[in-house]
Curated annotation (Swiss-Prot):
One GO CC term on file: membrane
Chief place of localization: membrane
Topological domain spans for side Extracellular: 46-54, 102-161
Region called Disordered, residue ranges: 139-161
Name of the protein described by the UniProt record: TM2 domain-containing protein DDB_G0278163
Membrane topology: Multi-pass membrane protein
Organism: Dictyostelium discoideum (Social amoeba)
Cell location: Membrane
Keyword Transmembrane recorded: yes
Segments in the Cytoplasmic topological domain: 1-24, 76-80
A Pfam family assignment: TM2
Occurrences of domain TM2 (ranges): 52-100
Similarity-based family: Belongs to the TM2 family.
InterPro entries tied to this protein: TM2 (IPR007829), TM2D1-3-like (IPR050932)
């Protein structure tokens, strides 16, 4: 029992010291708490932000690609198409008619209708559709429309089979 009393006394003395330490530690713990809190928050936010970020990036990329890249791609496509068309025309039968018609068409439509036809036929119909349906109606709905269209389209085939 005497031993217990001694332990208690020691504990009491220690408790006082511990209390002081605890108070000091508490400050550290409080400081650590906010630091630890942002970690999971950032993690969660990162995971949640990953989706919208990807959406925004895709939208920005699409926008830039649609304005700058599309023009460049369309120019290159037209050049390739023109070269191929010209070569094929030379080998074909109505080269003169084709050449004249193409020249007149290009000059008349200022490479607008011809390009549209070429772009619509050469690459997938996704770019022209997105360009027409996405860019014209609303700029803000462009980033929200692709994911919405992608999700239902991906879910539909999964649900059907």
């Amino acid at each position: 029992m005497g031993h217990h009393h001694h332990h208690h006394g020691g504990s009491g003395h220690h408790h006082h010291h511990h209390h002081h330490g605890s108070g000091h530690y508490g400050g550290g713990a409080v400081l650590v708490t906010p630091i630890v809190t942002p970690v999971p928050v950032v993690y969660g936010s990162r995971s949640s932000s990953y989706c919208p970020k990807s959406m925004t990036v895709a939208y920005v990329l699409w926008f830039f690609f649609g304005i700058l890249g599309f023009h460049r791609l369309y120019l290159g496509r037209v050049g390739t198409f023109f070269l191929y068309f010209f070569t094929a025309g030379v080998f074909g039968l109505g080269w003169l008619f084709d050449a004249f018609y193409t020249h007149k068409m290009v000059k008349h439509y200022n490479e607008c209708e011809f390009t549209k036809s070429c772009v619509g036929q050469s690459p997938p119909a996704t770019i022209p559709i997105y360009q027409s349906e996405g860019a014209y109606p609303t700029y803000q709905q462009v980033p929200q429309q692709p994911p919405q269209f992608y999700q239902p389209q991906q879910q539909q085939p999964q649900y059907q089979p």
